[in-house]
Amino acid sequence: MSLQRTGEVHRVTKETNVTVRLGLDGKGKCKISTGVAFLDHMLQQLSSHGLFDLEVIAKGDTHIDDHHTNEDVGIAIGQALSESLGERQGINRFGHFSAPLDEALVQVVLDCSGRPHLSYGLNIPSQRIGSYETELVKEFFIAVVNNSGLTLHIRQLDGTNSHHIVEACFKAFARALRLATELDPRRGDAIPSSKGVLEQAGSKPKQI
């Protein structure tokens, strides 16, 4: 199977201008500039540990706060992920990984099911990491999930340092997503579902 598994999204609102290019079968090349330094750092982890080629360029109303940029980047990444997966033929579909960072340990389990759901279990001690409000971590993943059709479970197993907890989360997410989106040679071009279809909830049903 020779699929071009890439997605590109250009999203413009009165609050932000976001461009995302995502390649699932990459080598971890990344170009990230969102105007939100900590978010940039986390997206670099996503690219590096998922081996995704990822470009994210965003300009937003960060003079107000980081909320709109953070959310709209998550939306665009989710849409690019959905586009790059297409009908999700031949993928493993499921992925899980537990990532440590010093005292922090975070587990991520996900399913490229087409059924958006987030179960979020991070307990981040501080309200900010640098200038980044830590409540935005959940908002980022909500945006990704709702626009990609992922079922995503995030569990904090240990950790006291806020930076370590969030970074371990993004690393675990990257590795779990890599496992789930990789192609299974035994499956060929079949869709990994007993129904014969995987699609995002609310989309038009396909004939099979």
From Swiss-Prot:
GO MF terms, alphabetically ordered: imidazoleglycerol-phosphate dehydratase activity
Subcellular location, principal: cytoplasm
One CC-aspect GO term: cytoplasm
Subcellular location: Cytoplasm
Reactions listed under catalytic activity: D-erythro-1-(imidazol-4-yl)glycerol 3-phosphate = 3-(imidazol-4-yl)-2-oxopropyl phosphate + H2O
CDD domains in alphabetical order: IGPD
The keyword Plastid belongs to this UniProt entry's keyword annotation: no
Gene3D superfamilies, per the entry: Imidazole glycerol phosphate dehydratase, domain 1 (3.30.230.40)
Keyword set includes DNA damage: no
InterPro entries documented for this protein: IGPD_sf, ImidazoleglycerolP_deHydtase, ImidazoleglycerP_deHydtase_CS, Ribosomal_Su5_D2-typ_SF
Enzyme nomenclature, EC number: 4.2.1.19
Keywords from the UniProt entry: Amino-acid biosynthesis, Cytoplasm, Histidine biosynthesis, Lyase
Domain of life: Bacteria
Listed PROSITE patterns: IGP_DEHYDRATASE_1, IGP_DEHYDRATASE_2
Pathway this chain belongs to: Amino-acid biosynthesis; L-histidine biosynthesis; L-histidine from 5-phospho-alpha-D-ribose 1-diphosphate: step 6/9
Biological process annotations from GO: L-histidine biosynthetic process
Family classification: Belongs to the imidazoleglycerol-phosphate dehydratase family.
UniProt-listed PANTHER family: IMIDAZOLEGLYCEROL-PHOSPHATE DEHYDRATASE, IMIDAZOLEGLYCEROL-PHOSPHATE DEHYDRATASE HIS7
Protein name per its UniProtKB record: Imidazoleglycerol-phosphate dehydratase
Gene behind this protein: hisB
